[in-house]
Every structure is written in C-alpha cells, then in structure tokens.
Amino acid sequence: MGKVIGIDLGTTNSAMAVYEGNEAKIIANKEGKNTTPSIVAFTDKGEILVGESAKRQAVTNPEKTIYSIKRIMGLMFNEEKAKEAEKRLPYKIVDRNGACAIEISGKVYTPQEISAKILMKLKEDAESYLGESVTEAVITVPAYFNDSQRKATKEAGTIAGLNVLRIINEPTSAALAYGLDKKESEKIMVYDLGGGTFDVTVLETGDNVVEVLATGGDAFLGGDDFDNRVIDFLATEFKNETGIEIKNDVMALQRLKEAAENAKKELSSAMETEINLPFITADATGPKHLVKKLTRAKFESLTEDLIEETISKIEGVIKDAGLTKNEISEVVMVGGSTRIPKVQERVKGFINKELNKSVNPDEVVAVGASIQGGVLKGDVKDVLLLDVTPLSLGIETLGGVMTKVIDRGTTIPAKKSQVFSTAEDNQPAVSIMVLQGERDLARDNKSLGKFDLQGIAPAPRGVPQIEVTFDIDANGILTVSAQDKNTGKSQEIKISGSSGLSDSEIEKMVKDAELHKEEDARKKEVIEARNHADSLAHQTQKSLDEHKANLNENDANEIQNAINALKDCIKNDNATKAELEDKTKALVQAAQKLGEAMANKNNAEQPKKKDDDVIDAEVE
C-alpha cells in the first residue's frame, strides 16, 4: 500500500496532505502554493486549465470557466438550490437525467467530471511532490452533505483514478488535525464556514476517540454568499447611478466577483477598501467606470443575516447534542470565511469563550484527512472516529408519510431494519421510496431512490411481512434492501444518489479522463513547439532585416521563404508538433547563411589591433 493522501475538495479552494514520518504534512502544488483554486477552464484552443491558470483567465473567459462546482454536486435540476445557482453562475447549467450538469461548447459535463479534473491536478501534483504514484485518498465532505452528494464526491475520485478509501466529514477531519483526539475528555465545537458550505459539529474527545454528538449546517451557505451580497450591492449602486444593469454582462459579472472577493479579504484587516473597476461597461455616452468605497460596517450590515443563520445552527446543534453552551470546552474555527472579524466576534460572543485558531483554517481539513489516511493504512494507532449521519433516513408509507428507519445523529456505520406490510388486499408488489430528511411528509424530504419488490404472495392487507433494511457504511453511503419474510424474495438498491451516473458511465469517464490526460500532454507539446517556432521566426526576421545587405539575393530569398513557411504553419491551428518542428528545422538550416554573414560582418568591423612593441619612427 502506497501513501494515502488526504484531500479537502473545497468549493473555492482545495488542499491536500500526507501522513509520513509520524506527522501530517501539507503538500504544495506545482505552483508552490498550499491551496489550489477549485476552478476548471476550457479555452478556445481546446486546452483544459485547472487551478491558478484557470483563475487567471476567468475575466476574459467567464462562460467557460467553472468555479463553485461543489454547489451543484448531487443536485437535482428541479431543486430550488439549482435554480439559485443558475442565477449566480455564468456558465450554463443543464438537465442530465434529472440531475444538474453543465454545458460547455455544446458538450455536457457532470459535476463529478469537473471535480475529477481538480482531483487529477491534485493527484499529479502530489505525485510530483512525493516522487511516487498516488492511487489512494481520503476525501472530505461537509457534514451536512446528503447521500447523493457523498456518492457524487466518491464518483469524482474514481473518475480521477483514485481509490477513495473513505469519505469523512470536514469537522471531524478538523478535530483530528487539531490533535483533539489526544486531549482529556472534552466537548468540542467545530465551526466550519468555507467557500460554499457551512457545518457546525459538536464532538466528544478523549482516550483517542473522536465521537460526533450532533451535526448540522447548510450545504449552500459560505463565502460565496458573502461575495454575492457585495456583488448585489455594487450592481444596485451602479444601476442607480448609470441606469445600466451590469449583472447581465457575464464578463462584467466576473470582474465584480473578483472585486467582491478581494474586498471581503481586505476588510478582514482594514476598516475600508476601494473597489475600482475602470471600463466595466459602456453605453451610447461612452465607457463607464465603477469606483466605490466599501466600509467594514457596510459589509457587516450586508451579511448580518448570513452570520446570524450560522448562530441559529449552533444553537440547534448544541441542543441536539443534549448540552448547554457552558458545557462546550473549546471552539475550533475552520474554513477561510472564519477570518471575517464579525464571524469571530459573533461566535465568541455567543459561546463566551476564546476561539481556537491555532492551525491554518484553509489547510486543517486536508491535514485531518491525511491523518485518517494514516489510520486506515495502519500508521496511526489507537484513534477511533465515531461519526454520525446528518439527516434521518426512511421510506414513504401509506398517505405519503415519511417513516424513519435511521434517525439523524446515529453513529455510523449503522444497520437497522423495520417490518412493513401491504396497504391493499392481494397486493403483488410494493414500491420502496427511499427518503432523507426531517419533514413528516414524504414530498418535503429528498428522494434518494426507488425500487420494487415483486412476487408477494396473495394475502389480505397487513398480513405480508416486508422487512426493510438500511445499511450505511463508514463513508455515509447507503444500501437499502427489502425482503418478503414469507417467500424469502428480496430486492436491494445501492443508492446511487441523484448523480444519475451508472457504473458503466463512471468507467467511461475514467477512460475519458485518461484519454484527455494524453491529449492534454500532446496539446501542451504542440503549444510549446508553436511558441518556440514563433520566437525563432520573430528573431530570424529581425536579424534578416538588419543584415540583408550582407547576403546575396538568393540566400536572402531562401531565408525569407523559410520564415514565411514557418509563420504560415504557426497560424494553422491544425498544425501538428511534427509539422512545426520540420518547418522550424528548415528555417534553422536556411538561417545558417545569415549567421555566417553576421559573423563575417562582425569580424570585418573589428578594429585592427596595434602591436605595442612597434614604434612608429624613422631609423637612421
């Protein structure tokens, strides 16, 4: 078993770490950074950019630059959250088998495929850093991710060529990273406010056991939402001043997004910042510029309800854990958005305790995941994680009621069964609708899947005994089975979530990812060959223009023809690496005569050296 890497696949940024030499270490990417932007871009030349390179070109290529893909991971297209995401994101969200996907230049990609490209970049960078192949990983997800979102995350890892040993909750991972498993028995609260999600988890630690008592949160609340408040404010102010609706312009919207994110970061240390976006748009009267001062007080008023929503979640989770605020020993702050001063102030004020900020909030989750990797590999001894299911699981029963089989807060892995019966006389089959959520009516909860149990023996209603079993593994992924206890007939469904991906589709995506990897490498070679050719053509043309007088006409024409041929090849987008190299080689050979002419000219211009021993004088 090789090294297992821990990956925090974030909404805004991702990070990775490895456990070696009895300690967890953050792995820097090829750019030397400890975090990688969770951004994928498709260029007009067919390149796929990931991370910093994708982020740098976002303003000029907004419709083909994919960020915050985690926000639609595992979402059904008709869900309200999908509609909200569609309004906010510049790229096109489409319906694929009922699930959210995106469309780029007429091609449809699932969130799993986009996430896989981020994971492939992390995998390759980890291999470069470690000097060995990486095939296994522990990937973290928000504690409040439902079954569909967890399954989709695991599928992304598979497509990227990773064997995902475990999906673990981010707050639990953070608790491991802080070394809380080594402390005396304490009640710990982890407050995790990331780029797109919010989790709050209460854990009990002690004797090398980390046990989750309760968890809650919002899979659609994070730093992006703080940015969006600033974007809305700036757009409204701009419209009031100019009458122009700037949010309809995707390029302007991307510039607004970057400016809002930067302003948010600056206001963590400054009381005021200026947003200056020249030439943001134009109308009949000419170009328009956006210049606006934003104070920390204004930013706090724009985002106050978001912060209060997190405080409300804290209250609920502490109550679910059967505790009071006073029983919380320590508060651990995780996620980049916890740097916002008002967030720290409100959490500290509510719990009435100093906050633990001893580890980088952007890296702590990946570090914890690597420790869990060490546990699974056997390098870390005597650490036990007892996580819980964030939402109740059950089935739809007579009258459209949600009947719970596994309650939220149940320690996983878990397996529970309940016996149900038929609703009508001589009913030959039952449909099992699997649900996740806390609402009393089935329609108000999330449907995870449906299957039928056929061949029930004729009997009056209420007589057949149908045993339904829910089995959740350590990743929080669910399998449901139903058995007619009279006939022994059974049916099982492994919940694939709303990702809509079959095993064969995932396998195809794995192969496609490998294929693209080779294609990308070939495209990079062509680009490098084109760049080299362009540089040579430019330099040779410049030298030819300067030294043409020192060449005979035939040689000069031969060199010019070789330059023109190379330039034509460079302009041809379909030119292969071999064609570019052949034309480059031809120019190098033709230009040898130019080099000789330049050398001869230099020699001719060298001043004749006088012999110091010779005296110019008459001799008698």
UniProtKB/Swiss-Prot annotation:
InterPro entries per the UniProt record, alphabetical: ATPase_NBD, Chaperone_DnaK, Heat_shock_70_CS, HSP70_C_sf, HSP70_peptide-bd_sf, Hsp_70_fam
SUPFAM superfamilies: Actin-like ATPase domain (SSF53067), Heat shock protein 70kD (HSP70), C-terminal subdomain (SSF100934), Heat shock protein 70kD (HSP70), peptide-binding domain (SSF100920)
This protein's record includes keyword Membrane: no
GO molecular function: ATP binding; ATP-dependent protein folding chaperone; unfolded protein binding
CDD domains reported for this sequence: ASKHA_NBD_HSP70_DnaK-like
Gene3D superfamilies xrefs: 1.20.1270.10, 3.30.420.40, Actin, Chain A, domain 4 (3.90.640.10), Substrate Binding Domain Of DNAk, Chain A, domain 1 (2.60.34.10)
Keyword terms of this UniProt record: ATP-binding, Chaperone, Nucleotide-binding, Phosphoprotein, Stress response
Function as written in the Swiss-Prot or TrEMBL entry: Acts as a chaperone.
HAMAP family: DnaK
Record's protein name: Chaperone protein DnaK
The species this protein was found in: Helicobacter acinonychis (strain Sheeba)
Source species taxonomy: Bacteria, Pseudomonadati, Campylobacterota, Epsilonproteobacteria, Campylobacterales
